[in-house]
Amino acid sequence: VHDLNKLNSFLKKSQDTALHKKLFIVGGGPSGIELACKIKDIFTDQFEINVIEKSNEILNKNKIFNREQAEKALEKRKINVLLNSTVKEVSETKISISSEVGITSLDKDIVIWTAGVKPNLSYLETDQITKKFGRILVNNNFQIENHKNCFAIGDISVIEGMEDLPITAQVAMQEGNHLANNLELLIQGKDPLPFEFQDNGEMISLGIGEASISGLGVCLLYTSPSPRDSYG
């Protein structure tokens, strides 16, 4: 809440200034891309926006169509994208970025961190639970190895053989529903059913009145004719 209030205050103050401020968004996933486009549409000239992404492409776990539309949206808005880059240090006025060319120190006014999810497993410091990618490894029934009466779902877990599933609400909700049904089966003395993810598609907001939708065999770029709104 403190960080959100700080960001809100910074953006409101920036709306009333002609200064060209340098804003860095760390993370080229959905949150980072949506935020970059939205801020640029609201504050057209106040910011130089830079998106920092550690991999070689933005939205690397999202659908190709949405990624391509996002790249076009960023280019149209003159938002800089720094690929294969990571943040080494952030000070009051500088941000140090490590890339293929070395470490570069750049001036900054604000840094917004959207670089993904890392669960806190400090309370599970034990060799009896197998972990992968910093998450609890489970089978396709969500059972923890060697602990068949213990289950893990959502951001804290990774399903063996399904490591590429995105960390999204859609996946977590389906996991929750499936686990609830499996628990009922187990209570009845029946075998649990393996989880199968049903991809219902995804939508990425690309600024004011613009979005990319991909799924269920359909790819759409939506652009609203409505006027630009303002920051309130």
Regions found by a protein language model. Name each.
Residues 43-140:
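A Rossmann-like FAD-binding core segment of flavoenzymes
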Residues 1-26, 30-45:
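Glycine-rich dinucleotide-binding loop and its adjacent helix/turn
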Residues 1-19, 105-177, 181:
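FAD-site-proximal beta/loop scaffold in flavoenzymes
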Residues 28, 54, 155, 208:
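Cofactor-binding loop segments of dinucleotide-utilizing enzymes, especially the Rossmann-like FAD-
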Residues 171-197:
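Internal hydrophobic alpha-helix adjacent to the cofactor/substrate pocket in enzyme cavities
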